[in-house]
Each structure stands twice: as C-alpha cells, then as structure tokens.
Amino acid sequence: MKKEIVLTVFLIAIVASLFAQKSEVFNPSNKAIRGYDPVAYFTEGKAVKGNESLTYHWKDADWYFSSTQNLNSFSKNPDKYVPQYGGYCAYGLSEGHKAPTDPDAWTIVDGKLYLNYSKDIRTKWREGEKERIDKADKIWPGLKDKE
C-alpha cells in the first residue's frame, strides 16, 4: 500500500511538471511572433504580418509568412531567421526571466533577430545591448524549458 501511494505521488509530480513547462518558443495562440513573418525582418527591414495560408510548423509553434519565398527560405534554414531566446523578450532574459514580446519591438544584431516586450524596453536594451546579449545567452539554457 505504501509503495502504491509513493508511486502515485511520484507520477502526479511528473505529470504536473510536464504541464508546468513552457514552450521554448513564445507562441500565444500557437502563433510564433504573434503571426509575424520572421524572414521579413531580414529581407524587408520591418515587421510584416504573415498570411494564415502560409504557415510552417516548427518547434511546437506555427510560423507565419508573408510570401511563399519567405516560407521556403525559413523551411530550409529556420535557425537563420528565428528570434533569439525563442522569441521571448531579450531584455527580460538578460534580467533572468521570460517575458512576452511585441513584434514591432525588434532589432537585428550580428545577423540575429532579438525581440523585446515594448519599444521602450527595446530602447533600454539597446543601451547595453552587447552586455545584455552575453548575459541572456548564459541565462537562456536554464530558462528555455521553464515556466
């Protein structure tokens, strides 16, 4: 009887921890970058809303694209275009926590896309961008699968 109780408690703890884990990709309503096209940041230099008929499922999220060309580019090399830290706020990560993002609060640094919570936060992040990237790069591996 005691073994069954211990086993039951153990199984409940495992199931609860699975539900407590957050996706590695920030994807409200299962839309990565809230439905914006990740490739467009690089090719058009601006945030562009994706088309619901042009999607690609990757890392438990649906990625939206504004053109077939962008969809094809992404499908060949997603890592080239995805935002750093799974699309969570770069500033927040540098402070040790996950935070949601605004697709219009973005920056490309050394060929990598970074998103932030808001344009005001992006301004703060840009003031010490290199140091913040170094901090967030160290923190991200421990936070990416956490609540």
List each language-model region with its residue ranges.
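Bacterial Sec-dependent N-terminal signal peptides
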Residues: M1-K22
